Amino acid sequence: MFLSESIQQKWQPVLDHPDLPEVKDSYKRAVTSMILENQEKALKEDAAFLSEAAPTNATGSNIQNWNPILISLVRRAMPNLIAYDICGVQPMSGPTGLIFAMRSRFNAQNGTEALFDEADTDFSARNKAGSSVSGASAAAQTGANPAVLNDSIGTSTGYTTGDGMSTAYAEALGDASGNSFAEMAFSIEKSTVTAKSRALKAEYTMELAQDLKAIHGLDAETELSNILSAEILAEINREVVRTIYRTAEVGAADNANSNAAINTSAAGIFDLDTDSNGRWSVERFKGLMFQVERDANVIAQRTRRGKGNMIICSSDVASALQMAGVLDYTPALNNNLNIDDTGNTFAGVLNGKYRVYIDPYAANLAANAAGAKQYYVVGYKGTSPYDSGLFYCPYVPLQMVRAVGQDTFQPKIGFKTRYGMVANPFAGAGAGDNITADNVGAINSNRYYRRVQVTNIM
């Protein structure tokens, strides 16, 4: 629905307004068009409400006067949300929505998930009862690492492969109840996302409005509206970032998320003094880059979707990568990117493939102190808006209410927004795990992101 060409054509004058930053990304244009449509619908519904700020015979004009300001703010804010860069954005056309996931299964709909881990080379060479037709045991395929073959050269202990069935056995399949074909199935699972709300209000006196206008040339209602709306949008930005921080799996650990350390002194921690060899700082910083690559590789193994391709980090980690000569800062200047200083900051491209974002709110004051803790989060976001570990689902981005106090007769304004947030159904910490309704996932559970603490950076 939100990809409808007619909706985009309707809002093209707003999307292409010369006084506003250009929205080049086609998906951002589509999502912004849908949000503008939802906003217009909400404003039309509110136009029928009784407003205390004016007589009952003027309620329509009282609210409609605010439409252009609301629409302009939505147009400015929506394309600049960090959600477009680090998670998926799926606008909702109603207060609730469904997310469906199809899983391939062995044997039955409640069987083990298939097409995720390595294919079992012996499964289709058995009958349904599990009898191996190649003469080997039912578990003919063993091992996961071919390197173990070199432990005892000349034998295949610890790493075996199933092979196909003979013609005679294939012809006999199905001739008896105990010799039926091996079977596969699929299951359709769903999780729901429900719109939640944020709300703020502000009050001011008519005397304040008069004095502010006379002395500073400012409109009190406009300034307070900007404050309220900016705060709500900033909070949504931080909710997205902090949710990823909280739910990301522990990095610098094994790929089963059991927090067992792999070649680091402690799981989840990369200590540049002990975990990275080098004669001087730049060589140790390159060791940090190798650890980033390893975590990105684990994401590919854990999701089977792709290698990690974006990083959120503290500024000192980004500086270390830049000093190592692997972070190219120039794209941020050459591409004229719109960097939001109050939200995410695009730093550049790492090794030609990782988009790096600096969190300006990361605690960074004790960077040189003993035991100072820096961090990075590496994650995967595909080219499709459906290919992400977390989904931000805007419904009505901004809704304004105006009223007058019944006792003081002083003006009041309020803003509300509605949106949902849910994790990818496949983001659970184990094969076959599912995300429940309205759930962003438990702590350390989202396999699309990995979080690492970096210590002794200096």
Residue locations for each model-derived region?
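Short, glycine/acidic-rich hinge or "gate" loops at secondary-structure transitions
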Residues: 220-221, 236-262
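Short linear, low-complexity motifs centered on an aromatic residue
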Residues: 108-126, 246-250, 426-440
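Assembly/oligomerization interface modules of large self-assembling protein complexes
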Residues: 89, 98-195
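Sequence/fold signature of self-assembling virion shell proteins
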Residues: 77, 83-85, 164, 168-178, ...
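Extracellular/periplasmic catalytic domains that process cell-envelope and extracellular macromolecules
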Residues: 92-95, 194-196, 303-305
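Short, intrinsically disordered N-terminal pre-domain segments
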Residues: 1-19, 247-248, 260-264, 327-329, ...
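Surface-exposed intrinsically disordered loops and tails
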Residues: 157, 251-277, 428-439
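Extended assembly-interface regions of large multimeric machines
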Residues: 1-127
